[in-house]
From Swiss-Prot:
It comes from Pongo abelii (Sumatran orangutan). Residues 65-79, 88-103 have a biased composition (Low complexity). The gene is GLE1. InterPro entries: GLE1, GLE1-like_sf. Belongs to the GLE1 family. One of its GO terms (cellular component) is nuclear pore cytoplasmic filaments. This is mRNA export factor GLE1. The modification Phosphoserine is found at S88, S99.
Length: 698
């Protein structure tokens, strides 16, 4: 409340006034003292009078002339000052007259004289005056002490303020540093954000660039693919054109041969009832037609399929023409023979007429297969040039055997040892051929090549060379070729993939040593006549076992091997042959042609299709040959090869099926499914086990 606040202010003001600072003794009544005792007693000097006289009065006398106030006023003013009487005995003793205030007796004498001259005042006034002086001194000392304490307090406050200011300055510096750090962080974040945005923009530009580059590469790739496709189409068109052109030349060659046969029929002109000139005129027209087609095709670039078809129709017409002429000649000859017989019947006697049918009766020519059944339809005549080639190879093989006959029949132990070492050196490396690594295959090839080149090789821990015997090279070549074929008969028959490493080594040796290749063919044709292709005929007087051996069957103790084993061996040798004609040694001279290339595979396939099929055998061999060599023939002959496959499907399959029994349909079904799958996908897969470029790096 306001009144209470004013009361407290009043009390505080009274306490701060001079009277409020007076000291009052409240326990005087308890001590039994009389209030008026001191007033009623006689005046007496205070115990402080000596000190006052000594210290205070001299100063008062000196300052009295200068003072403008009277003693009475001074006393009055002194009386008005608060009186403080210390109660401490120490203080009283300090101001007592007994304290040593007079150093000598002279001074004490002067003081006594001075004291005597002074007018004695009342004891209470002196006491009050002393108290006043004492109070002033105490007050002054207290003020000095308070000032000192105040100064110390102020210094303390100044130090505190200084420390506080220092702390505030530190806080300010910290705050400023924090602010700068925050600004730096903000600036750094802004810079990082800007950098990230720049990087993002850069990445975006890079992505756009990559996208555009990808699109451009795709376009370039598409353009390149289109160019390659067009180039491939152009190449195929040219190759097809060249094939058609070669076919046209072949047709013209055949046409000319037929024309020569037509001209050769002049000797029968007298027998014919028809006009031979009409046949010759039509033949000349057909020859001119084919020549005109070839001439027009040469001028326009390459012949078209229509031109080829027209030429084939002309050739077919020429064949029909020649066949009709042959029929006319045959008919005329029959008529002439009939006339001769009739004339002979008139001239000869009845006995001679009875003998004439026996003379004209043809002797039987039995043709029996391995089972003893007659198979006259299998006796298809092979082309003369093929039989000549077959016979030349067999003659060369026999001549080679005769050459080293002295070495094989020698009784000399040294010669026998040389023969055994040479045989091992020739056959063991062939047995070691495998698909383990290309480097291993190259070592085997180099060893065989060194042996055939007359260089010494290591075999069985000994050095062997064909120069150890004059007949050593012939012997090694024969045994090496025999071993290659035997590997096809045994190893390839069991593991079809083995055909390729064996074939590539055989092909490389064949290229460097052609005689070995001829001996390989001779051994192959002898063990597998279907690789010619050649179907041996059963001749009159021939033993059945000999005929079965000619067909390729193994006969031991008059027992013929099982059909499955026979087909397995034939399959292995055909697979080896199909691999040889398509493979070349990768380290050889690429500029030289293959010594026995794909053209022989085309020839084999064409000739096998021109012959009547054999039950179970033809289907098996065709499947093996096409599975191994079909991909290479497809790449080489392309359209013509596909035409041949269509021919097999449409014309040859019915012929095989017609002669195949229900128990032998497995091989035919396998061939049929393989061919239909190839025609459906328009591709022949790469055979399993084919040697790739990575194999030669292993």
């Amino acid at each position: 409340m306001p009144s209470e606040g004013r009361c407290w202010e009043t009390l505080q003001a009274l306490r701060s006034s001079d009277k409020g600072r007076l000291c009052y003794y409240r326990d005087w009544l308890l001590r039994g003292e009389d209030v008026l005792e001191e007033c009623m007693c006689l005046p007496k000097l205070s115990s402080y009078s000596g000190w006052v006289v000594e210290h205070v009065l001299p100063h008062m006398q000196e300052n009295q002339p200068l003072s403008e106030t009277s003693p009475s006023s001074t006393s009055a003013s002194a009386l008005d000052q608060p009186s403080f009487v210390p109660k401490s005995p120490d203080t009283s003793s300090a101001f007592s007259p007994a304290s040593p205030a007079t150093p000598n007796g002279t001074k004490g004498k002067d003081e006594s004289q001075h004291t005597e001259s002074m007018v004695l005042q009342s004891s209470r006034g002196i006491k009050v005056e002393g108290c006043i002086r004492m109070y002033e001194l105490v007050h002054r000392m207290k003020g000095t002490e308070g000032l000192r304490q105040w100064q110390e307090e102020q210094e303390r406050k100044v130090r505190a303020l200084s420390e506080m200011a220092s702390e505030q300055l530190k806080r300010f510096d910290e705050w400023k540093e924090l602010k700068q750090h925050k600004e730096f962080q903000d600036l750094r974040e802004v810079m990082e954000k800007s950098s990230r945005e720049a990087l993002g923009h850069q990445e975006k530009l890079k992505a756009e660039h990559r996208h555009r580059a990808k699109i451009l590469n795709l376009k370039l790739r598409e353009a390149e693919q289109q160019r390659v496709k067009q180039a491939e189409q152009e190449r195929l068109r040219k190759e097809e054109g060249q094939v058609r052109l070669r076919a046209l030349y072949a047709l013209r060659e055949e046409m000319l041969q037929l024309s020569q046969q037509l001209d050769a029929s002049e000797q029968h002109k007298g027998l014919l009832k028809v006009d031979l000139a009409a046949f010759q005129t039509r033949g000349n027209q057909l020859c001119s037609l084919i020549s005109g087609i070839i001439r027009a095709s040469s001028e326009s670039g390459y012949p078209t399929t229509e031109s080829q078809a027209e030429a084939e129709r002309a050739l077919q017409e020429m064949r029909d023409l020649l066949m009709n002429l042959g029929q006319e000649i045959t008919r005329a000859c029959e008529d002439k023979r009939r006339q001769d017989e009739e004339e002979a019947q008139v001239k000869l006697q009845e006995a001679q007429m009875q003998q004439r049918p026996e003379a004209h009766k043809e002797p039987p020519a039995p043709s029996q297969g391995p089972g003893g059944k007659q198979n006259e339809d299998l006796q298809v005549k092979v082309q003369d040039i093929t039989m000549q080639w077959y016979q030349q190879l067999q003659d060369a093989s026999m001549q080679c055997v005769l050459t080293f006959e002295g070495l094989t029949n020698s009784k000399d132990s040294q010669a026998k040892k040389i023969k055994m070492d040479l045989q091992k050196a020739a056959t063991i490396p062939v047995s070691q051929i495998s698909t383990i690594a290309g480097s291993k295959l190259k070592e085997i090839f180099d060893k065989i090549h060194s042996l055939l080149s007359g260089k010494p090789v290591q075999s069985g821990g000994r050095s062997v060379s064909v120069t150890l015997n004059p007949q050593g090279l012939d012997f090694v070549q024969y045994k090496l070729a025999e071993k290659f074929v035997k590997q096809g008969e045994e190893e390839v028959a069991s593991h079809h993939e083995a055909a390729f490493p064996i074939a590539v080594v055989a092909s490389g040796i064949w290229e460097l040593h052609p005689r070995v290749g001829d001996l390989i063919l001779a051994h192959l044709h002898k063990k597998c006549p279907y690789s010619v292709p050649f179907y041996p005929t059963f001749k009159e007087g021939m033993a059945l076992e000999d005929y079965q051996r000619m067909l390729g069957y193994q006969v031991k103790d008059s027992k013929v091997e099982q059909q499955d084993n026979f087909l397995k061996r034939m399959s292995g040798m055909i697979r080896l042959y199909a691999a040889i004609i398509q493979l070349r040694w990768p380290y050889g001279n690429r500029q030289e042609i293959h010594p026995h290339g794909l053209n022989h595979g085309w020839r084999w396939l064409a000739q096998i299709l021109n012959m009547e099929p054999l039950s179970d055998v033809t289907a098996t061999l065709l499947f093996d040959f096409l599975e191994v060599c079909g991909n290479a023939l497809m790449k080489q002959y392309q359209v013509q090869f596909w035409k041949m496959l269509i021919l097999i499907k449409e014309d040859y399959f019915p012929r095989i099926e017609a002669i195949t029994s229900s128990g032998q349909m497995g091989s035919f079904i396998r061939l049929k499914q393989f061919l239909e799958k190839c025609l459906q996908h328009k591709d022949i897969p790469v055979p399993k086990g084919f040697l790739t470029s990575s194999f030669w790096r292993s």
